[in-house]
């Protein structure tokens, strides 16, 4: 057998092994996630979510069990990085994971696939940002931020803000829900307020409802009228989806009363009905 033939055989085996690996990898990931979902939930983690996740006690026992499984998979697959001296404790990781995983009930078993690392600052962090001033000149300014979702593999949060949101769940503001909603939106590589929808949902209906609600919010903000949705949602469709998600989970009854079509489409998307959680 010539050296060329040996090389061809080795190359063929290597290519076959790679192909088998690529084919089998999704099955391995599913097996690993199913195993994590079935594991006993740590008592220390349960204590944290019972204390820090306002709506946990309002979930059904089945939903609580499902959320626990999501949290275990999430914490296995995502890396937490403390910034500016912040120590990543169980409290930090489990609290953030519990809030973020509320968004996974809608059959999103990909677990924010673009996300690899969550950077957590002790408080608001400063970034340099290019902005246009009143004279239409672009200049660089230092801006304080509480959170940010990147289209590649990172998400940033202020732990101080996360703690504040825990204490004020029903105020309509939640940096974890907001930034992880952006992750859902960015899953297809675009940030345009249109996440990947379940098969049962229609993109045309989504677009019709979201566009109408977004334009209505823009009009009310421009005219100084009160809104259930935070005015920041009028920035662009991507921010509207993130703000609508916050409001859906934190002010569900008010959202349904004022924006029933929006509430119903988010209810179908997230497969939860937060109105049932409010007294």
Protein language model annotation of sequence segments:
Residues 28-143, 261-275:
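A metal-dependent hydrolase signature that marks the N-terminal structural subdomain at the beginning
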Residues 68, 186-190:
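Short, function-defining helix-loop hinge/capping sites that tune catalysis or transport
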Residues 1-33:
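N-terminal signal-anchor transmembrane alpha helix of single-pass membrane proteins
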Residues 60, 171-187, 242:
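Active-site recognition of the HExxH zinc-binding catalytic motif
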Residues 20-21, 38, 212-214:
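Short, flexible segments with low predicted structural confidence
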Residues 95-112, 121-170, 190-279:
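Metalloprotease/metallohydrolase-associated module, dominated by Zn2+-dependent proteases
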């Amino acid at each position: 057998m010539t050296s060329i033939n040996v090389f061809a055989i080795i190359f063929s085996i290597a290519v076959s092994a790679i192909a088998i690996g690529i084919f089998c990898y999704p099955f391995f990931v599913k097996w690993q996630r199913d195993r994590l979902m079935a594991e006993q939930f740590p008592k220390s983690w349960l204590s944290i979510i019972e204390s820090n996740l306002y709506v946990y006690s309002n979930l059904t026992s089945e939903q609580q069990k499902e959320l626990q499984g999501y949290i275990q998979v999430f914490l296995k697959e995502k890396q937490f990085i403390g910034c500016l001296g912040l120590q990543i404790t169980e409290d930090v990781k489990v609290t953030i994971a519990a809030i973020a995983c509320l968004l996974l009930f809608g059959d999103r078993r990909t677990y924010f696939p673009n996300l690899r690392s969550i950077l957590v600052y002790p408080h608001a962090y400063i970034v340099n940002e290019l902005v246009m001033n009143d004279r239409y000149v672009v200049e660089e300014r230092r801006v304080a931020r509480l959170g940010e979702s990147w289209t590649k593999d990172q998400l940033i949060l202020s732990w101080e803000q996360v703690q504040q949101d825990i204490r004020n769940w029903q105020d309509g503001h939640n940096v974890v829900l907001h930034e992880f909603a952006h992750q859902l939106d960015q899953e297809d590589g675009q940030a345009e307020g249109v996440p990947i929808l379940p098969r049962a949902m229609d993109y045309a209906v989504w677009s019709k409802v979201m566009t109408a609600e977004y334009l209505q919010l823009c009009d009310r903000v421009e005219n100084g009228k009160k809104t259930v949705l935070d005015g920041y949602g009028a920035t662009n469709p991507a921010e509207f989806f993130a703000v609508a998600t916050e409001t859906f989970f934190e002010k569900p009854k008010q959202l349904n009363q004022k924006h029933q079509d929006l509430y119903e489409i988010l209810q179908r998307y997230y497969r939860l009905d937060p109105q049932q959680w409010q007294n």
